[in-house]
């Protein structure tokens, strides 16, 4: 399950992220992008000062997104993400998850698939496998 942080690293041509992408393409492991990640990435596009820069990044995101299947936010995912977000917020010891991160984590937990991210907040989610690069 792709996190926004990893998608951004791929867009930035991060060597470690590209190496992980090549490694994953050689396996039968599905690489999926939650629609919450698409929303978060495009929110970033809306914050770019120069339209030419936003257009270039939009094209890159479109290319990256075409190469992966997407995961919709179903009611089941929304419920799991909401409970997870509340649990993390109520904890004195666990990292806080933003809204998109709780959705990404919920997808990983419900599907039993790892999340690809260097975001340390995911490490505090009980039962979630996190793959770093």
Where do the model's predicted regions map?
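Short, well-structured N-terminal submotif of metal-dependent ribonuclease cores
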Residues: 1-33, 46-62
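Short, hinge-like loop/turn segments at secondary-structure boundaries
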Residues: 48-52, 88-90, 132-133
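Acidic, PIN/NYN-like endoribonuclease modules and their adjacent C-terminal/linker elements
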Residues: 105, 109-133
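Histidine- and aromatic-rich ligand-binding microenvironments
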Residues: 2-3, 33-34, 97-98, 119
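Short, structured coil segments at secondary-structure junctions
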Residues: 27, 66, 125-126
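Active-site neighborhoods of divalent-metal-dependent phosphate/nucleic-acid chemistry enzymes
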Residues: 69-114
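A generic structural signal for short hydrophobic patches within well-formed alpha-helices
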Residues: 7, 38-41, 78, 122-123
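Hydrophobic alpha-helical core bundles mediating ligand binding, dimerization, or RNAP-core interactions
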Residues: 44, 61, 65, 84-85
């Amino acid at each position: 399950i792709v996190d926004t942080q990893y998608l951004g690293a791929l867009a930035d041509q991060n060597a470690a992220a590209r190496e992980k992408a090549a490694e994953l393409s050689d396996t039968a492991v599905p690489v999926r992008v939650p629609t919450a990640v698409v929303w978060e990435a495009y929110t970033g596009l809306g914050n770019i000062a120069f339209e030419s820069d936003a257009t270039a990044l939009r094209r890159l995101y479109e290319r990256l997104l075409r190469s992966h299947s997407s995961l919709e936010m179903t009611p089941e995912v929304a419920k799991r993400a909401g409970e997870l977000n509340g649990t993390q917020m109520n904890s004195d010891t666990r990292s806080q998850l933003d809204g998109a991160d709780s959705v990404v984590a919920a997808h990983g937990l419900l599907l039993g698939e790892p999340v690809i991210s260097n975001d340390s907040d995911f490490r505090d989610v009980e039962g979630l496998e996190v793959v770093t690069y």
